[in-house]
Amino acid sequence: MRLKPIAVDDFCAVRSLANVTFSPAGASACFTMSQAKKEKNCYESRLYLLKDGAVRPLTGGGKEASFCYLDENTVLFAADREGGKEPSLSSRFYKIALDGGEAELAYTFPIPVSQVFPLPGGDLLVTGSTFPGFENLYTGDKKLAKAYLADKKENEDYEVVTQLPWWWNGGTYTRGAYESLFYYDAKKKALTRLTGVGLAVSDVQLTEDRKTVYYSLLDVSVPRPAYFGGADLYRMDLTSRREEAVAKSRTDFEIATYALGRSFLLLLAADGKYGMNTDCDFYKLDYETLAVSPYAVYGESIGSSVGSDIRHGGGRAMKMDGDVLYFISTRFDSAGLYKLENGAVAPVMVRDGSIDCFDRRSSKMLLCALWDMRAQELYDGTGRRVTHLNDAALRGKYVARPEVLNFTALDHEVHGFVLKPMGFTPGKKYPVIFDIHGGPKTVYGPVFYHEMQYWAGRGYFVIFCNPTGSDGRGAFMDIRGKYGTVDFDDLMAFCDAALAAYPEMDRDNFFETGGSYGGFMTNWIIGHTDRFRACASQRSISNWTSFYGVSDIGPDFSEDQCGASLWPDAEKFWQHSPMKYADKVKTPTLFIHSLEDYRCPVDQGYQMYSALAAHGVESRLVLFRGENHELSRSGKPKHRLRRLNEITGWFDAHRR
């Protein structure tokens, strides 16, 4: 069969799976399935049910994502099916029986609610929004709600900033809102506040008997909440409503998360040895005495940091079964499933690719994974594929298989990959695109990446690697104070190795692109070498000094990654800023930036573009309204198409 190339809009054919969850007894599993809709320029998400080996849709509204099982036969999910035109704060949850019937309204809350946790007798634990100055909106007082909406309308043209960070990527100005924990009395249809005003709740977990709740608390009433310093762990007896501190974060013991075991609690905490990117070790906490003791030294990444542009949504990365912890961890270039038992870590399911989320119940396992260069599917605990939801998306298409290309640079190995162009003929010359990942604490792995496959289908070699600073290799990720040095050397040496290994690569038609950290490196590269025919810098960093003051992670991330404080070490910031070297640039460069990117704000793109334009360098800046740092992964479908067409068109236009 003659294969067709991957099309620029083929990401719209891919279905993204997330939030895999077993029913209480494990007889069924529910998950979300999302898909980009090009004509509607949006994403639609629905709940699907896997039972007895068959998959069927459970909801049809197109906006369902958050859900939980109420019991073995009933799923509760968030949706807004009332379609009210008037502004409202309320949120609604519906329940649907798995054996048929229409969804029916189950709960209406007077505030935005993000999570619900069923309790015995029909009551709920709820995490919902608290708004400063209107802390009692949860009571359902209609006059108070009206006053809040009127105040919001009155002040919609103004932003008053009193905290750091003052905005979040993917959102807007913080405005001081935070999550609180509430108890919902189903008979009275009333919420009761459980956690204090000015204290943000996260990572809520119920004990198996549902009598005690654990949660992380962070004081957000202060001008600079410690978002990057770990939170404190608390618990509350739901009968007495007595709250007590369980464990506190310190500079050398930053609590990232935790898991509730049968006889002890597991803490995941980092000692800060490698700054804010330090990986966690495991600690054991006694339920009675609250004594904390070391359980297992790990120092590897938790969760999947394997990059791809065909995911939409998340899911569980760790779960306790008795006193055994099952967790996803990124090692080298892949994310596998491991277990921690009796203080020792052992592999459970490790294959090339990425396990993105999982669930385990009654010895059953379901994994959502990117394996075998396929889009996401569900697999059982033996690795057997149990769904075929994405077969049609790639059927009859050329999918380049990544060929491993490793080499030794100084005292370490650099791991990389090569995708051959469609129709590759030995001895024929082909243009090359070098793609650099973000992070920098992420990895490229052997998984399906739409943009790379699109370029391979258009006749390009695509090469990519994991330089110093990448995840999956412990301390290898520590690049503090070294940006633009050893990483730059690794990247350039990888290009040399690729050209030597594949004589079909056309060194005169060599292109480069990257986003976020990859955008930083693009900006750095064009100021330090002219080897690339043209480059495309995406959502980049160009100036650490200005980044400090405008990014949602600016003060913390910039000082951590530069390995210095802006005061008195401003020269160190400038030394590692691509803007310092912008007068050396000769390479034609395209800049892609989103106007609502608050992680690497648009001023970073403005600065590099202005510098190049002022020095007469061919350059182009393309800005996207209504998009943020996630443009390439979850931006509006038409915007994603425009972005990829801009980059590809830039390279095509500069080919000799």
Task: Map each language-model feature to its residues.
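Residue position within the beta-strands of beta-propeller blades
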Residues: 29-33, 75-79, 125-128, 213-217, ...
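Predominantly five- to eight-bladed beta-propeller fold
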Residues: 45, 130-182, 227-232, 280-283, ...
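Non-catalytic accessory segments flanking enzyme active sites
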Residues: 18-21, 159-162, 167-168, 172-180, ...
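Cap/lid segment of the alpha/beta-hydrolase catalytic domain
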Residues: 389-508, 515, 549
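Blade-terminus and WD-like Trp-Asp/Gly-His loop motifs, strongest in beta-propeller folds
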Residues: 21-28, 66-74, 116-122, 204-212, ...
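Active-site-proximal cap/loop segments of hydrolase catalytic domains
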Residues: 467-656
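Multi-bladed beta-propeller domains
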Residues: 1-17, 50-65, 87-89, 96-112, ...
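Short, solvent-exposed loop/turn segments at conserved positions within beta-propeller repeat blades
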Residues: 39-44, 84-90, 135, 172-177, ...
